A protein has these predicted regions:
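Beta-strand elements of repeat-based all-beta scaffolds
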Residues: 1-121, 126-160
Length: 160
């Protein structure tokens, strides 16, 4: 068990064996935040850091190809203020991308009580998401504001 603050979370690892071969670790969650969200995960494909924000509620960034110490250094040392913030510091995410050019960074923004409002991919291309008055996904737009997908909700009443 790994301690985080006054909480304890299990160190989670997954192992596999192919045929009669040796067991190998395929997933290892090395570090957690104060609420138990994974912060640093090592898989066969490589290492991934997850940065949470919006007071620990939502994923703000997924950083592939960097260690937690590299991310901490790029973010100015302490990750807690970033994670506790009601909205993430966008300037820190921009600096993170500049400081870790070898990493593949995907970042997310959210509208409270609704959902994801934007996703910025590792190339810096942004997809925007809009919602209707009932908080249903209404439209997905590209980096230039052009509609990529539109959603139309039609309900019918079955008459018996």
């Amino acid at each position: 068990i790994k301690g985080v603050s006054d909480h304890f979370f299990p160190c989670y690892s997954a192992w596999e064996r192919v045929g009669e071969g040796a067991l190998r670790e395929v997933y290892n969650c090395i570090d957690y935040d104060a609420l138990g969200h994974p912060l640093y995960v090592v898989r066969n494909e490589g290492k991934t850091v997850y940065l949470w924000s919006y007071n620990y509620l939502h994923l703000a960034a997924e950083i592939k190809g960097a260690t937690i110490s590299e991310v901490r250094t790029a973010m100015g040392g302490d990750l807690v203020p970033f994670m506790q913030a009601g909205t993430p510091d966008r300037a820190k995410l921009v600096r993170l991308r500049a400081s870790l050019p070898q990493a593949q960074i995907t970042s997310y923004t959210y509208q409270p009580m609704t959902g994801v409002t934007s996703v910025t991919d590792p190339c810096g291309v942004v997809s925007y998401y809009e919602y209707d008055l009932l908080q249903r996904l209404n439209r997905q737009k590209d980096n230039y504001g052009r509609t990529i997908k539109a959603y139309d909700y039609r309900y019918s009443v079955n008459s018996y």
